[in-house]
Amino acid sequence: MCLILLSKPSLGDYKFVLSSNRDEFYERKTKNMFWWNNFDGLLAGQDLEQGGTWLGITKSGRFAAVTNVREFYQIDKKENFLSRGDLVKNFLNSSLSPEEYVQKVEANKYMGFNLVVSDLKHFSIISSQGIESFNQELVVVGNRALNTETKKLNNAKEDFKSILNQTFTHQDLIELMQKPVSYTHLRA
C-alpha cells in the first residue's frame, strides 16, 4: 500500500513533517529521486513509463504527492485516462496556489487518486471524489478513498503520532514507512 503521512503542527523549525512510500507496482520502471534537468529546482523520483512522479518538492518549497485509489470499475477504460504522475509534476511546475491548482484539476480525466499539494503555507487535498478540506494536524493518505479507515492506516497513523510526540530522527521515519509491510496479513 502506498502511504503518505503528513503533519503540519508547529514543530520547532519544521514547516511540516512528511513520511511516504511507494509500495506497489514494483515492476514499473522508475528513477530514484534526483534533481530534474528540465524543471528548475525539482527534486523527485520519476516514472519512466509516463514521465511523471508520485512525490516531489521544489527548492522554492512547493510539495506534492499522489497515491492511486483502487477503483476497479475503471480498469477497462484505462487507456482513456491521463497519467496521475502528471498531477504532481504539473503542480510543482506551476505558480498556482494549492487552492487554485486543485480547483483546476479535472479529476474525471484520471484513474482514482488522492493528491496532496502545498506551498508550505497552504495545503490542499483533492481526490477522484473531489476536493477535501485539510484542517487536521495529521493526514494519512493511502490507496483508498480519503477518510477510509483500515487497520494498516490506523496503525501507521498511531505510529506516526508516537514518533512526532518525541525527538525523532530521519531513520525513525524510514523505519515507520517500512513497518506497514509487516501489516500485509491484515485485511485492508
Which residue ranges define each predicted feature?
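A contiguous pocket-lining binding segment that forms or flanks enzyme active sites
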Residues: 129-170
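Conserved small/polar residues in nucleotide/adenosyl-binding loops
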Residues: 184-188
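Internal, conserved structured core segments that host functional sites
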Residues: 62-132
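Short beta-strand scaffold segments in enzyme catalytic cores
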Residues: 3-7, 53-57, 113-118, 124
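A general structural signal for short secondary-structure junctions and capping/turn motifs
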Residues: 7-10, 46-47, 56-57, 105-108, ...
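Short, well-structured alpha-helical segments that form the helix of a local strand-helix-strand
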Residues: 98-105, 172-181
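Structured loops at beta-to-helix junctions and adjacent beta-edge loops in soluble globular domains
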Residues: 21-22, 58, 69, 118, ...
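Glycine/small-residue-rich interface belts in oligomeric ring/scaffold proteins
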Residues: 11-83, 87
